């Protein structure tokens, strides 16, 4: 299968890389293209890294507002790259501000979408508390 993953921050890069390892174990013919980081590139090949998260991450409302034009351009680039790769599935790793927009677009274009997010600390605490 052809997998396109989008992770926009270091934690997403780690989880995306681990997911890619698991996918490769079950699908030795897996082909990857992704927005991520060095860990994902280590699994999927640096030639398949479309955009490094260091180019896409903007934290805080001021940074986001200052970079709205860049974010819109990156969204367009991402959509074009996904279309060119023609994946069987689009896997969105956390990064909700960007990925929820990509999910909506992908659904409108008939692309299967999975949203992959590791449990947050608060969710883990629910199972370890004495309450």
Task: List each language-model region with its residue ranges.
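Active-site and donor-binding regions of nucleotide-sugar-utilizing enzymes
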Residues: 2-129
């Amino acid at each position: 299968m052809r997998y396109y993953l989008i992770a926009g921050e270091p934690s997403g890069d780690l989880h995306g890389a681990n997911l890619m390892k698991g996918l490769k174990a079950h699908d030795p013919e897996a082909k990857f293209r992704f927005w991520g980081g060095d860990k994902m590139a280590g699994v999927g090949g640096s030639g398949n890294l479309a955009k490094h998260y260091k180019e896409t991450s903007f934290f805080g409302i001021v940074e986001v507002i200052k970079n709205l034009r860049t974010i819109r351009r990156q969204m367009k680039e991402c959509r074009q790259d996904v279309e060119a790769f023609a994946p069987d599935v689009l896997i969105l790793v956390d990064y909700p501000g960007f990925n929820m927009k990509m999910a909506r677009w992908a659904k409108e274009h008939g692309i299967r979408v999975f949203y992959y997010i590791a449990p947050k600390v608060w969710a883990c605490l629910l199972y370890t508390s004495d309450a």
